[in-house]
Design a protein with these regions (language model features):
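Short acidic/polar inter-strand loop motif in beta-rich domains
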Residues: 11, 104-108, 131-139
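Disordered, low-complexity segments in secreted/periplasmic proteins that are enriched in proline
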Residues: 45-55, 104-118, 146
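Surface-exposed coil/turn segments at beta-strand junctions on protein surfaces, enriched
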Residues: 53, 65, 89-91, 119-123
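Beta-strand signatures of extracellular beta-sandwich domains
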Residues: 71-75
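Glycine-centered tight-turn motifs at strand-turn-strand junctions
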Residues: 81-119
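Short beta-strand edge segments in extracellular beta-sheet folds
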Residues: 140-146
Length: 146
């Protein structure tokens, strides 16, 4: 669901309101709430060769009732840290974006490293761990191939 505003000229703005629609009075009254994540899709062929490089990022949405100390980590099925996402700690609705890559994961490409590509994770189950003032909230992400 999108809210779209446009002018008769060239301007247009589209806002994805799906997460906003999930903000209930119970969510607003909570210290923190972690919504179901958007899985994303890895490129066919891992971003190498004929499969192409198109992929969809994964998104983690969360609500904070008040300003808080926040961290957001992606873990693999074994509980090992895969990536740490930038996470805002101000009160309100937040979205964090994961490029489906491993932390520090740019791989060199042809051209002396000029063309860099992400070190994509493999398809499978991952866990987003949101820590708010020392309390953990978890949701599952399952990125697959395009």
């Amino acid at each position: 669901d999108f809210l779209i505003a446009a002018t008769h000229g060239r301007g247009m703005f589209a806002l994805d309101v799906r997460q906003l629609q999930k903000v209930t009075p119970t969510v607003v009254a909570s210290v923190a709430h972690l919504f179901d994540a958007e899985n994303g899709a890895l490129p066919a062929g891992g971003g190498r060769g004929r499969g192409g490089f198109n992929y969809e990022r994964a998104y983690v949405h969360y609500w904070l009732g008040d300003d808080a100390a926040v961290t957001l980590e992606i873990q693999d099925a074994q509980g090992s840290m895969v990536n740490v996402l930038e996470a805002g700690g101000s009160a309100g609705l937040h979205q964090a974006e994961w490029a489906l890559d491993r932390l520090g994961g740019n791989q060199g490409g042809r051209g002396g490293g000029f063309f860099r590509r992400p070190n994509f994770v493999e398809p499978g189950d991952y866990t987003a761990v949101l820590t708010v003032n020392g309390v953990e909230y978890r949701t599952t992400l399952t990125p697959g191939r395009r």
